[in-house]
């Protein structure tokens, strides 16, 4: 069961519905998938960046622009290994960005909020835009590299800007 205000969002299009059905994606009888709408995504991003701006130690917010879950990917991007079969079409919560359809609209909304509110004077905080999906092996390898550099005290803000999938 889901509160009526959320169901109304699926019906009126303010929430991404499964195959434009006006309904949420029901994974199984116990799990219904619902992701944040535009306003909720922006509020979440603002909350995240407000907290991260206060960091006193090495911190990198690495944003995967091609999607954030198995259900948040285009059919072109989908694979069994990433949790959504290409034959099923777009993931049930995939919301492509109108300016860059290979990127998630939620990711671009969050990125915009991060850029507007990021304390660029905090040398402990870097925000990195990656042309990856969160489930890409290359993305996981990059996260591991970044964490390793932090643990080894080699990390510096801006040090990854020349990597292949780093866009900003």
Task: Please give the residue ranges for each predicted region.
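C-terminal non-catalytic interaction/assembly regions of soluble proteins
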Residues: 5-168
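Oxyanion-binding "anion nests"
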Residues: 1
